[in-house]
């Protein structure tokens, strides 16, 4: 299945574990009742109407439940949404619009979003870790890897 190519083996194993924990009767499918129970376990109480709406969005075969491939599709859609948000964040941080984050742009962002503010040494360590190609700047791909690794 093509969607599986989006994820590493480690991610797929994590998703499989998550799927199995939601599939409480072990039949290889998550029912609306199991999905509702999963949300309740993290103290989110959704109406049956909302659960049915969510199931309808992922239940591509009309079976009224979610198999692992549909579960992976849901994860891929969540992943895609996160990638869009991260790309927008990168563009916002790239103040000179040159397609990369300079150490100063990253320092400004990191200092503004941490409390207490990060030290120069801490920020330099992050830049060093993220700058895979050694050009002294953080491109979008390096930024994505940095965020996903944290």
Curated annotation (Swiss-Prot):
**PROSITE patterns in the record, alphabetically?**
EF_HAND_1 (PS00018), EF_HAND_2 (PS50222)
Any matching Pfam family: EF-hand_7
The regions listed as transmembrane in this protein's record are: none
Domain (EF-hand): residue spans on this chain: 10-45, 46-79, 81-116, 118-150
Instruction: List UniProt keywords, sorted A-Z.
Output: Calcium, Metal-binding, Repeat
**Keyword presence, Membrane:** no
Positions of Ca(2+) 2 binding: 59, 61, 63, 65, 70
Residue positions binding Ca(2+) 1: 23, 25, 27, 29, 34
Question: Where does this protein hold Ca(2+) 3?
Answer: 94, 96, 98, 100, 105
Example of a GO MF term? calcium ion binding
| Residues annotated as binding Ca(2+) 4 | 131, 133, 135, 137, 142
| InterPro entries cross-referenced by the UniProt entry | CALM/Myosin/TropC-like (IPR050230), EF-hand-dom_pair (IPR011992), EF_Hand_1_Ca_BS (IPR018247), EF_hand_dom (IPR002048)
Q: Let me know which tissues express this protein, per UniProt.
A: Found in cell lineages giving rise to the aboral ectoderm, a squamous epithelium covering the surface of the late stage embryo and larva.
What does this protein do, in the record's words? Calcium-binding protein involved in larval development and metamorphosis. Likely to function as calcium buffers mediating the transport of calcium from the sea water to the blastocoel where calcium is required for skeleton formation.
**PANTHER family in the cross-refs:** CALMODULIN LIKE 3, MYOSIN LIGHT CHAIN 1, 3
Full protein name = Calcium-binding protein SPEC 2A
The gene for this chain is SPEC2A
């Amino acid at each position: 299945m093509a969607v599986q190519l989006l994820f590493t083996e480690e991610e797929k194993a994590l998703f499989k574990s998550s799927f199995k924990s939601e599939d409480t009767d072990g039949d290889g499918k998550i029912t609306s009742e199991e999905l509702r129970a999963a949300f309740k376990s993290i103290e989110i109480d959704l109406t049956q109407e909302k659960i049915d709406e969510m199931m309808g969005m992922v239940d591509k075969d009309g079976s009224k439940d979610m198999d692992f491939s549909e579960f992976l599709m849901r994860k891929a859609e969540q992943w895609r949404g996160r990638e869009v948000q991260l790309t927008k964040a990168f563009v916002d941080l790239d103040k000179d619009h040159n397609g990369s984050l300079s150490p100063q742009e990253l320092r400004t962002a990191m200092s503004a979003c941490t409390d207490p503010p990060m030290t120069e040494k801490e920020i330099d360590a992050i830049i060093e870790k993220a700058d895979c190609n050694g050009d002294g700047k953080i491109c979008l791909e390096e930024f994505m890897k940095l965020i996903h690794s944290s």
